[in-house]
Design a protein with these regions (language model features):
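C-terminal regulatory/interaction module of P-loop NTP-utilizing enzymes
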Residues: 1-214
């Protein structure tokens, strides 16, 4: 199986800021701030109550920045307590009579983004606070910082140099009701900006939705 398939050639549906504001009930000012912070910081966490629509908002935020609905440039995973560097970056896995070095989902996605440096890519992580960031990212923890994008570091497993592309954005999501927030990894706090997602009952988009129902 090709672990880094070529992007689909079919036409993509356009997706604009106006589409986002219609689909996701936040104000235009908050949207502009969210986009500005993500482009500057490269990494952001959407936090809010369960069911408020963080996953929905995260994907449409990516679409709006890309200007189109392109699933080839989005990767979605969910962290859990047993998620590891071997799953995320690379590690040895049983193969035949021995072990074989396998590349993880983030490594492969970075390689895909590096092949298209003029395009924006989005790596979306659900339940990001449930994983051990230092354990999962390893030496890449420094490379995801905005100031270190495109700078190279040597990977422990294969000894090759590696970098995280500048136009790869990481969007994490977490529930504010989660008890593990109190134990939030300092590495996470330092490398990500935080943005609250709340029910947008007073936004123009929601008012238009209610009027359409009446």
């Amino acid at each position: 199986r090709d672990e880094n398939p070529a992007p689909s050639k079919k036409d993509k549906d356009k997706y604009t800021k106006e589409n986002f504001l219609k689909d996701v009930y936040i104000t235009e000012a908050k949207y502009d701030r969210l986009v500005s912070v993500l482009k500057k910081k490269k990494n952001i966490i959407l936090q809010g109550a369960p069911g408020v629509g963080k996953t929905f908002a995260a994907k449409r935020l990516a679409y709006s920045i890309m200007g189109e609905v392109d699933e080839d440039r989005i990767e979605f995973i969910q962290f859990h307590q047993n998620y590891s560097y071997e799953d995320f970056v690379m590690g040895y896995r049983p193969a035949g009579d021995g072990f074989e070095l396998k590349y993880g989902i983030f490594y492969r996605f970075c390689q895909k983004a590096a092949n298209h440096p003029d395009k924006d890519y989005f790596f979306i992580i659900d339940e990001i606070n449930r994983g051990n960031m230092s354990k999962i990212f390893g030496e890449l923890l420094m490379l995801i910082e905005a100031d270190y994008r495109d700078k190279r570091a040597t990977l422990a497993y294969n000894g090759l140099s590696f970098s995280v592309p500048k136009r790869l954005h990481i969007i994490g999501m977490m529930n504010t009701a989660d008890r593990s927030l109190a134990m939030l990894d300092y590495a996470l706090r330092r490398r990500f900006a935080f943005f609250d997602i709340k029910p947008g009952f007073g936004t123009p988009g929601f008012r238009e939705y209610r009027m359409a129902l009446d």
